[in-house]
């Protein structure tokens, strides 16, 4: 019982102990840790190479070696062997090679790593590089023979061969190592530098290169040290003659590698003095094309006395060689020149930067030529190979010349790989590495790259917009667009303010006088006449003067005003001009005979208050519109006073003209016809106190065949007694309503009558016109003989002047000064057709008598060039309205040549012919015509003009003032009348008046 219990207790006590032992053992385990890392090693000697690696851990870790990340198999015939302590043995290391051995060039055998692992983890050591020692056979630079002078510095060059590790250079002299003396000997980069040459430095020198792979010895170089000599006699060196006998190409040395450079052997012969040159130098250069500039000579010191080797040349070049002797600083003459052409070799380097770019069904191949030192001749072209694959066969192309690109057509998608090689005369060189390009179908590329299409297009657009030509094109287009816009705006604005068709004139009187001298291109009737309704003018709120010569449809009526009533401004405005000379005059006949007005008592009327506001022609600020006030001088003032009133202190050509005075025959005829017309006017509901007498004047007929001043006399008129006609109240005058629209230009003020008329009669007044001779005294412009603006026509008088009823009679004056019975004439515009009974009176009164004296009735003045609207008044009332049939008759008359229609006799004869064709109509418009405002009277008017003096007519030319003054001075000095009678003109006028119309024709008034 007791023994059994002890065994049980003993069994129970061993279990915890076992657990403690197990836990203690587990507590001693640890992960592996590398204690000794492998080191870089170099094979030295024939024995195996060792690489050590030690690691710690519990349990002990397992060691494994890896080469370049790959585990080693350690199975024969693998040269690697693992020792139990983890050391790696390389049993067969690579042999130490030579320069031509390709294996010797690969000195790096790889990177070895050690890996230790157990159940707790793995540890990896650092990498160790294993390499082999290599030393090539050839020296990069061999030492050369040379001659040195005592006390001078010289250098022995040596370039050791390539090796691993880098070889060290040592110099040997005469088979023994050279003891380097500090300050005298210096080794730099393998070359030996001697600061001061001594005579003991002569000997044979050799360069030795040494590393772990062994050592290499260079060729022996002989150094000669000479004493310094006095070169006072350089004649000896100049006498040396060198003959270059031969230049031979040496075979390439295989020890120099697969790409050796050419070398030549030079042989020469020296002749001359016994003392030879101390050294010889080879001079060489490449041969240039004929006519080209030669390349510079390259110099190379030769290591021989009569022959030497020369390197540093290039294959495929033509060289020129020569030798030059030298002794210290002195140089002798050069030898002869020999030529040598080196053969070409294949290029030693492939083309560089080969690229492939896809195109539209093509592939663009481009490259860069190989470096110049690797051409080995002249590159004559390139060879391009396309490597074949499963879908594309191989192909090749030859590119001739210096072209460095090729376009290859692609027929199907796939992978394209190309190689390029340079070609010389020796053949194609080394090809480049293959460059591949994968071409996919358009649908596949679109499905694979849907998101790249948009950004690529945007980027391409940005690049295109940044190009200079695109920016310049956009700038030019924008500039042209702005220019076109500006031109359109300018044309639209100009279309609103442009002047109407027709001729235009300056308001300067000098320009007018010069313009009147040439009328070869002027038409008798202007094509710019406008027809303005008289009722519209009268009902408008604007002043009458602002309506003169303006078209209601013209928005710029102020600018197109046809009259300027103030003094001429320095700036000459441009106004329309029709180059016609037809004017008219309106005179108001009082019912009673007024006394002749004097300068102290002016016989004028004041402007009514309701018309005072309309005295300004227009409210525009335009300079021309602001000067349209009536400024015609009053006839009641003396010429001198009127001259001062107009501020004319001196006589000028442009603003001075003689005051023409009418004859008594004209005054008598006007009063007589005025008495006739009052009978017709008295038939209206109200009594007419005053009547308007209209004088119509045809413009002067210019003689194109002569530029001389031609004078024409006024017809004579007998004296008549001054009687006072009865007066009537102005308030009883009835207004006459307009019957037809008219384009008549209205004056701004009535013209007072300055001469008395015949005794009163029932015919108080009438509208009458002067004879053809007197009608030439004025031009067809609008004016008023009142100077101020207070003498204006009342609306009733204007309406009476503009339009008369169809039943009214408008008698015309005749050339004859004798009165005749009133008869209803027929008018054609400005042409008056009398009755048949009046033709007999004209035959009896065709002749004229000399002037007996007279009083100034309404003297016409030299006036401005007529305007289009004034020409309408002078050329026909029938053109006033479009619905008037008489306008067709006036148009027929006005379409004729103005050179003969200026004659009133011919015009009247033409009117008879027109009426005989059936165009005769009753007149519907008042024959009221006006004359233009003339310049103020000159103070000289009082000198040579008298009431009894009748002035002739003249035609204008620039020197008219001088001729007039000379003619008047001569004739007045002799006591003769200033203007002799013109019998020829009177006879012609009489003959014209005696003509009778044909039977059936309408009677014509030749007055």
Swiss-Prot record:
Which SMART domains does this chain map to? FN3 (SM00060), IG (SM00409), IGc2 (SM00408)
Drop me one GO molecular function for this one: cell-cell adhesion mediator activity
Please name the SUPFAM superfamilies in this protein's record.
Answer: Fibronectin type III, Immunoglobulin
Is Signal given among the entry's keywords?
yes
Sites bearing Phosphoserine, chain numbering: 805, 938
Q: Which cysteines are joined by disulfide bonds?
A: 53-114, 158-207
Per UniProt, residues of the Ig-like C2-type domain are 32-131, 137-224
Signal peptide start-end: 1-27
Q: Which residues form the Fibronectin type-III domain?
A: 248-345, 347-442
- Cite the residue spans of the region called Disordered: 531-551, 713-793, 806-826, 971-1007
Q: In which tissues is it expressed?
A: Specifically expressed in endothelial cells. Expressed in endothelial and intimal cells of the ascending aorta.
Cite the record's Low complexity compositional bias ranges: 531-548, 725-756, 763-785
Relate the protein's function as given in its record: Receptor for Slit proteins, at least for SLIT2, and seems to be involved in angiogenesis and vascular patterning. May mediate the inhibition of primary endothelial cell migration by Slit proteins. Involved in the maintenance of endothelial barrier organization and function.
Q: How does it assemble?
A: Interacts with SLIT2 and ENAH.
In the record, the note on similarity to other proteins reads: Belongs to the immunoglobulin superfamily. ROBO family.
**What is the recorded name of this protein?**
Roundabout homolog 4
